[in-house]
């Protein structure tokens, strides 16, 4: 099942791209004048024919072939913990700087009388 994104294959994205382009072309051709305005019908019918061909003649079977047991290996194990340690140190350093520069900032009293 190569090429699966969000549980759907490349054909769904191909159809979505086709219809987005057809919609864009139809909007652009609506502004045209003369005989070019009527070419919207041919663009729409062409997209409809391409869609029916892609839907009626699928390349893969509907049910995927059973696969063997997959072993999941975490190849980025050490890098993930190094990144976690680095981000934790930056977070703690930021909290320390926030504490020293913002929270513990001294507030000086104003003199009551000026002599």
Curated annotation (Swiss-Prot):
Mode of membrane association: Multi-pass membrane protein
Physiological role: May be involved in ciliary biogenesis or function.
The name this protein goes by in its record: Transmembrane protein 218
Gene name of this polypeptide: Tmem218
Family: Belongs to the TMEM218 family.
Bilayer-spanning residue ranges: 5-25, 38-58, 81-101
Organism: Rattus norvegicus
Assembly with partners or alone: Interacts with TMEM67.
Main localization category: membrane
Annotated localization: Membrane; Cell projection, Cilium
Record keywords, A-Z: Cell projection, Membrane, Transmembrane, Transmembrane helix
Cellular compartments per GO CC: cilium; membrane
Lineage: Eukaryota, Metazoa, Chordata, Craniata, Vertebrata
